[in-house]
Amino acid sequence: MKKIAIYCINYHSYDSLKDFLDSIEVASKKAEQVVKISVFIADNSIPSEEIDFKSQHYSLEVYPTGRNLGYFGAAEYVMSRVSPADFDYAIISNVDVLLTENTFVELSKIPHDSTYGWIAPSLYSQTYHFDWNPQATKRYCIIKLRIMRFLFKHPLLLRLKQIVLHKYRHFDTYPSGNIYAGHGSFIILTKAFFNKCGIIHYPVFLYFEEMYLAEECLKHQLKVVYLPQIHVLDIGGTSTGKIPSKIYCKYNYEGINYIISNYY
């Protein structure tokens, strides 16, 4: 039986959290013969509300952080208290996603491979009707990253770029296989990742978490693999969709600057 931990991060999104936990209940029940699920909630809400959810098919622990630590900051906060290395898989997730009935069943079927560091599932957007994964199939070149950093320093130019790209964007579909990075809303990390990389330590409040994980996998010769037979639904925008544009650019600038400084 495979042990799976879910580290989910909540910030004043209790309705979405309940829906997320309900979906875990359904998926856990379907896979109760093959997986054991433990859910750990990092609650960044200030003030936090009582989370009174009773499950018959997984264990649940709540960790109020007492302040908003951001996405990976909150995940690290809980991981420092409950080691992800004790599990076969550790999932880091937003609460604005929903598991499908067979999410854990399909994950349990994946053969053990010590070279896997990160598994990216199909993350289907109910808003845009496409799969967010893979987020990137190849590593970004330094020139592209520097251009992106420049744009985040100049929000008006960034907005113009977004308008142009939105007009001409198209969405490709991809077969399963090795990729550079998956999407950050639902991240499946393996025991091998934590054995080689340790618990996550990304000292940026928000954004570019995916590149941090991708670079850690590259550094430690671990694969990032896209496996679309594992299905997750993206509801989208519960917390990050509320961030003002100037703050959005500030966080992105800090994130991309960290990636360039530490990995390029």
Name what the model sees in each region.
Residues 13-29:
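Short, well-formed alpha-helical segments that are part of the catalytic scaffolds
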Residues 24-64, 82:
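Acidic donor-binding segment of Leloir-type glycosyltransferases
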Residues 65-82:
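Glycine-rich, basic loop-to-helix element that forms the pyrophosphate-binding segment
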Residues 87-98:
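Short beta-strand-to-loop acidic/aromatic patch adjacent to the donor-nucleotide binding site
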Residues 98-135:
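Conserved donor NDP-sugar-binding/catalytic core segment of glycosyltransferases
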Residues 158-159, 168-189, 241:
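A recurrent flexible, glycine/aromatic-enriched loop bordering the glycosyltransferase active site
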Residues 180-231:
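A short, conserved alpha-helix in the catalytic core of glycosyltransferases
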Residues 211-264:
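Active-site-adjacent helix/loop segment of glycosyltransferases
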